[in-house]
């Protein structure tokens, strides 16, 4: 099954690479003193023999210094086939983007415990004060940094399948964390892709706070990024309608569709070399960068 999966993802990755490489070689410089002879301008030499020959040269376009962050839901509901597919997609697509000169960071998020960790113990010791906020300890994982080559991350990605790693998912703080890492990058274009299979859930937190506490915080973080940040945000939901939260999103019904969805969305983003996508980024870059969500869990 793993080999078949790699083959399917590999074909999609090759399609992505062909599209990206075609974009890189789309521009030409004309009227140069050296390069490839420009046959279209030979008539000038015929009509005026004293006119020098004209040459042209292909010009690379490197996607304006781009970095992509893949943020993967490492919750318990992803156990088994979904997390294996997600890890395989991240691996192969990151290698593909890397070959095209695009840097990729791969991150994951879960919690350290099922029913609250030290955060809950501290709350109990304090006498259970009201509205405590988050009552579980976060686990944010860096599987691959943007500056490290993909060949060094192979063993790290295998950790996603480790027994006992996948627990609860507190999406809002994970999204803010990944976003802040991107804000510190020097690249001109920064893309954040969230892959999740459900709404934020942590039983320890939700049992003692107001309803939709984690979901409300997630919506606040998304709004900050989508309206005030230069980072381009996109989400893919596995069996979960993420279009309820994100402006730019797609929902798939089965993990086997993940590679196709990721590839399609990346092609769509990189096709935005002009037009509305570019103008949207410029508008966001003129806005104030977010300092974080208006209401933080603690």
Residue ranges, per PLM feature:
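Acidic, glycine-rich A-domain
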Residues: 1-298
